Amino acid sequence: MLTPVYEEQFHDHSYGFRPNRCAQQAIITALDRMNDGYDWIVDIDLEKFFDTVNHDKLMTLMGKTIKDGEVISIIRKFPASGIKEDDEYRESVIGTRQGGNLSPLLANIMRNELDKEMEQRGLNFVRYADDCINMVGSEMSAKRVMRNITRFIEEKLGLKVNTTKSKVDK
């Protein structure tokens, strides 16, 4: 029910966990951009994405598309997996179940905000799940993209960039 609604909104350069899309298509798109002269790579990896998704931010994003309050209420229960510590259960306001049926869609809804931001900035990018690469023409541009997109991810989406795995390279 939700997938067709959101598929219309998802960016063409988003390939992870989507119908009729695969990693090979993402690689082909990236190679095409590199062959066009965009040979500096900004490789951005999100740190522990499923553990750090803010439920309120996600529900706000979903509320822009889904207007039925009952549907939102049902969906809100899904990511609130809670935490069990010392034999005591408490609700969690961040994170979503990794491996759950709805998790990939919820993840793409959140990460679609990143896709829209990169498109608005005119970037050549490919995203597969929580890995994103931007292809640019110079080292200076690559460093600027890394800095600005990292700031967007952390300040606007409330997510964390994995600085160990993320890099600028040619």
Spans of features found by a protein language model:
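Accessory, often N-terminal, substrate/partner-engagement and coupling regions
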Residues: M1-P4, F17
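Conserved polymerase palm-domain catalytic core
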Residues: Q9-R21, Q25-K170
